[in-house]
Amino acid sequence: MSKFVGAHVSASGGVFNAVENAQKIGAKAFALFTKNQRQWSAKEFDSETIDKFKTALEKSGILPRHVLPHDSYLINLGHPELDAREKSLDAFLDEVQRCSLLGLDRLNFHPGSHLKKISEDECLANISESMNRVLDKTSGVSLVIENTAGQGSNLGWKFEHLAQIIDKVEDKSRVGVCIDTCHMFSAGYDIRTREAYDKSWGEFDKIVGFKYLMGMHINDSKAKFGSHVDRHNSLGVGEIGLDTFKFIMNDERMDDIPLILETIDDSIWAQEIRLLYSFVN
């Protein structure tokens, strides 16, 4: 079995609790926030917290590369204003260092927003520059850009945006992408039928490249196709439907990366994980 499915679990009470929460739902991968995602700063990890996390992870059998930490929602590496961008950069740097302390090798983030104050190209260049600065100051952690639904002034919804960011990143060995199925669908890439799925992923491969795929968010969508609205749903009850998730579970291009549920009903995550594994031919 080369698929590693889990969910974005709570780290409330300490990051080490995320491991237990992942195990409770039968996950082989998980995502977490390493700090409160709605605050700029957090107290530093003490050595006890780090040790407890690493010990719990080792006991769980979940590999560090199948853990996909997510950064704070406040961070905007493409911010049009320098002061605000620097504040985001400092917070992002701290998040990367937190991952490093926990022995994790990737950090998932939303690329950024132009806030209708600068052009898309300027915003994308800001994101790449911010990434370069963080990569210079850190080691061992890859920066994983998430595709977005394109809601508001958020960039990253087009594969070309992701490619443009990567193009200007100097150390391409430490950059990756995370594709969210809900965002992909809402951004206008159809994945509902075998033909549409193959076409959309073919575009992804041509424009970005599968070598950069370091994680996925597995979500159905409440919003209609191409609506640019980001509303997740439980698997099979949204606009995408179950076939897409069958395709993914049998697509070897998605092997050995964290496949993370962010579906809206956490009480059925264990069932959704079992469902996904039942799709494997």
Swiss-Prot record:
Disulfide bond residue pairs: none
Catalytic activity: Endonucleolytic cleavage to 5'-phosphooligonucleotide end-products
Database matches in PROSITE patterns: AP_NUCLEASE_F2_1 (PS00729), AP_NUCLEASE_F2_2 (PS00730), AP_NUCLEASE_F2_3 (PS00731), AP_NUCLEASE_F2_4 (PS51432)
Residues annotated for Zn(2+) 2 binding in this entry: 146, 180, 217, 262
Cofactor binding summary note: Binds 3 Zn(2+) ions.
Domain of life from the UniProt record: Bacteria
EC main group: hydrolase
Residues noted as binding Zn(2+) 1 in the record, renumbered to the chain: 70, 110, 146
Keywords carried by this UniProt record: DNA damage, DNA repair, Endonuclease, Hydrolase, Metal-binding, Nuclease, Zinc
GO biological process, one term: base-excision repair
InterPro entries noted in UniProt: AP_endonuc_2 (IPR001719), AP_endonuc_F2_Zn_BS (IPR018246), Xyl_isomerase-like_sf (IPR036237), Xyl_isomerase-like_TIM-brl (IPR013022)
EC number(s) per entry: 3.1.21.2
Cofactors demanded by this protein: Zn(2+)
Residues that, per the record, bind Zn(2+) 3: 183, 230, 232
Pfam families, sorted: AP_endonuc_2
GO molecular-function terms, A-Z: deoxyribonuclease IV (phage-T4-induced) activity; DNA binding; DNA-(apurinic or apyrimidinic site) endonuclease activity; phosphoric diester hydrolase activity; zinc ion binding
Family, per entry: Belongs to the AP endonuclease 2 family.
Function: Endonuclease IV plays a role in DNA repair. It cleaves phosphodiester bonds at apurinic or apyrimidinic (AP) sites, generating a 3'-hydroxyl group and a 5'-terminal sugar phosphate.
Stated name of the protein: Probable endonuclease 4
Natural source organism: Sulfurimonas denitrificans (strain ATCC 33889 / DSM 1251)
Biological classification of the source: Bacteria, Pseudomonadati, Campylobacterota, Epsilonproteobacteria, Campylobacterales
